């Protein structure tokens, strides 16, 4: 794209996590091009990696509109990355890189904004229910933490309502939930959903079940299984407690997702994002996830109508940042 002075105008998007930063160029149709992934640890500052990308792609003299999705609060000029030593001023970053515009959004705002663009190949439906056009959408994502966001459509534009829903109080539903809650409460003053629906949360469920079942782990390493190891052994059927832990994780995720649906009237669907659940889609399909999602007493008939999906698109952050930027600069 060119402006009136024949300067190339580009839209730059980024998805910045604690380990990697992904940068790309997008167009008005939200196509993502020139995707590059860099290790955050290889650069002393965010400006260095963005400058490197622009130089590498011959874009230093372009008019750049940038939208950066970042895993930390973005409502002040001064930004401190949660899991990185990077600190910067939004105003100074824009000036240093000579950007035409700079917009920072939360990482889950980006994921939420990607949802209306997803095709059937970029998501997997769990259970029944049909999405209603332009109705509210909810998304949650177990990963390092538990991200939550909501989308509403106003005058044919999607707007994201962020929040910290993952930190709401955990509410046990069945007897095993209660036992896990009681066991974890011996060391915690308060238990949020994030402390169960995350990588760390799955590990906590497993460790609680080892004690509840009065079983000694076969060795010290077995008692410190990672979330990935727990899910892998559960799927393989080689560890009964791992299976029990993953099954309970799926149930609790169903309860939490169902709560989101009722709270926000998410008749456009509830979407599951994050790096954990896509590892065991078939396991989730065969679990009690959907039963827990629908079982809401007198309101069960509402959740029975609401579809649930797992996002399988590999770059939802970049796609959502592109959608956000194109809505700002149509």
Swiss-Prot record:
Quote the SUPFAM superfamilies the UniProt record gives. Actin-like ATPase domain (SSF53067)
Q: Where in the cell is it found?
A: Cytoplasm
Q: What class of enzyme is it?
A: transferase
Reaction(s) catalysed by this chain's protein: D-glucose + ATP = D-glucose 6-phosphate + ADP + H(+)
Q: Which UniProt keywords apply?
A: ATP-binding, Cytoplasm, Glycolysis, Kinase, Nucleotide-binding, Transferase
Q: Which positions does UniProt annotate for ATP binding?
A: 14-19
Q: Which GO terms describe its biological process?
A: glycolytic process
Pfam families xref list: Glucokinase
Annotated EC: 2.7.1.2
InterPro entries according to UniProt? ATPase_NBD, Bacterial_glucokinase, Glucokinase
Chief localization class? cytoplasm
Named from the GO MF annotations, one term is: glucokinase activity
Source organism superkingdom: Bacteria
What is one term from the GO cellular component aspect held by the record?
A: cytosol
Under the heading HAMAP family, the entry gives: Glucokinase
Record family assignment: Belongs to the bacterial glucokinase family.
The family database entries (NCBIfam families) matched by this protein are listed as:
glk, PRK00292.1-3, PRK12408.1
Q: Which PANTHER family match?
A: GLUCOKINASE (PTHR47690:SF1)
Instruction: Name the chain's protein.
Output: Glucokinase
Q: What organism does this protein naturally occur in?
A: Colwellia psychrerythraea (strain 34H / ATCC BAA-681)
């Amino acid at each position: 794209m060119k402006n009136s002075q024949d300067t190339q105008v580009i839209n730059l998007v980024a998805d910045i996590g604690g380990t990697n930063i992904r940068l790309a160029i997008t167009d008005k149709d939200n196509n993502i091009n020139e995707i590059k992934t860099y290790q955050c640890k290889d650069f002393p500052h965010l400006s260095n990696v963005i400058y490197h990308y622009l130089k590498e792609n011959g874009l230093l003299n372009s008019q750049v509109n940038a939208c950066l999705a970042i895993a930390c609060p973005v409502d002040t000029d001064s930004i401190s990355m949660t899991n990185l030593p990077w600190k910067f001023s939004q105003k100074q970053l824009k000036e240093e890189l000579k950007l035409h515009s700079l917009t920072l959004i939360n990482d889950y705002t980006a994921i939420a904004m990607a949802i209306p663009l997803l095709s059937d190949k970029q998501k997997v439906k769990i259970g029944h229910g049909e999405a209603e056009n332009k109705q509210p959408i909810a998304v949650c994502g177990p990963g390092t933490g538990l991200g939550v966001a909501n989308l509403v459509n106003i005058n044919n534009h999607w707007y994201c309502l962020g929040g910290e829903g993952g930190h709401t109080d955990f509410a046990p539903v069945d007897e095993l939930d209660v036992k896990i809650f009681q066991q974890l409460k011996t060391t915690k003053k308060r238990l949020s959903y994030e402390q169960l629906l995350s990588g760390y949360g799955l590990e906590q469920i497993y460790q609680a079940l080892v004690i509840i079942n009065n079983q000694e782990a076969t060795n010290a390493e077995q008692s410190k299984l990672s979330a990935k190891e727990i899910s892998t052994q559960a799927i393989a059927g080689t560890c009964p407690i791992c299976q029990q832990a993953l099954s309970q994780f799926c149930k609790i995720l169903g309860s939490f997702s169902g709560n989101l649906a009722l709270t926000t009237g998410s008749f456009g669907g509830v979407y599951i994002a994050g790096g954990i659940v896509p590892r065991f889609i078939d396991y989730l399909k065969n679990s009690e996830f959907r039963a827990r999602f629908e079982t809401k007493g007198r309101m069960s008939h509402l959740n029975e109508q609401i579809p649930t999906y797992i996002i399988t698109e590999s770059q939802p952050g970049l796609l959502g940042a592109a959608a956000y930027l194109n809505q700002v600069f149509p």
